């Protein structure tokens, strides 16, 4: 990672008929913007800083799969999104963001990581999102999730009722900040 030089890569390319053109690294503050730096920001849950370095929001794609059913049972269904294992995911926590389904973008309350209240479940999700205002079946559909900001880190609650109140509060705040109706993009 980052151990080569433009000259070495240019020689490698020349042997394979590929022209290599080097460029200067972008600098933010006193450090270069690199993929490693961006991955570290994402891993720390700082999706706002990562977006600044990327020039866009950090997002992932996946397919909606059946989940544990706890969200639906508590009144806020979630889309459990299967993401490739090698994708850098943000720190465990609740995020405000957006979910794109087909040609529509919905505001979303997103949970990244294993929810602490259900950590013993064999089918614990890594990424689940409540698409605010969405009603319909998403199973098997491709969804893109864009992370806008962290709302709070993951934590355990003293009871299921306390968890429900917290999630309802998260969803209500995100709905207020981002809206409850989709935006058509296609």
For the regions a protein language model found, what residue spans apply to each?
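Classical nucleotidyltransferase
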Residues: 1-77, 134, 154-171, 178, ...
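Phosphate/ribose-recognition catalytic cores of enzymes acting on nucleotide-derived substrates
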Residues: 12, 67-186
